[in-house]
A protein has these predicted regions:
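Cytosolic nucleotide-binding catalytic cores of signal-transduction proteins
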Residues: 23-114
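Short, small-residue-biased leader/transition segments that mark boundaries at the very start
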Residues: 3-4
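Signal-transducing coiled-coil linker helices
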Residues: 14-21
């Protein structure tokens, strides 16, 4: 039972650390690119636009594309950096690309130019 409690505490600690990391990443990124969310949303069809909840700075989608904006385009690296599976990153990337207002094949290039 003690081992189990330690395991749960450890998992909670990792979750808390990851959330703290996300928060610091988001704040730093938005300091560098204060108009990123608006500019990113302008690349999407209106009904697909992404808005963070009041308690978060960036959503998972926005965080993935923030990394792409910074030049991290390898899905493996993005998955490792954010602690998601490769399949999750592929799904997010393809879902957002399909919601592009303009040329879907240029979507990620357009993000890099924001």
């Amino acid at each position: 039972s003690d081992v189990y409690k330690r395991q749960i505490k450890s998992e909670q600690f990792i979750r808390d650390e990851r959330n703290e990391f996300y928060n610091e990443f988001d704040k730093s990124f938005l300091k560098l690119f204060p108009h990123f969310i608006t500019s990113f949303n302008n690349l999407l069809v209106e009904e697909a636009r992404v808005y963070p909840k009041s308690d978060e700075l960036l959503t998972t989608e926005l965080r993935i594309f923030a990394l792409i904006r910074l030049g991290v385009v390898d899905s493996n690296k993005i998955a490792h950096f954010l602690g998601y599976s490769l399949a999750t990153i592929y799904n997010y990337r393809s879902r957002m690309r399909n919601k592009a207002a303009g040329d879907k094949d240029r979507f990620e290039q357009d993000v890099m130019n924001l």
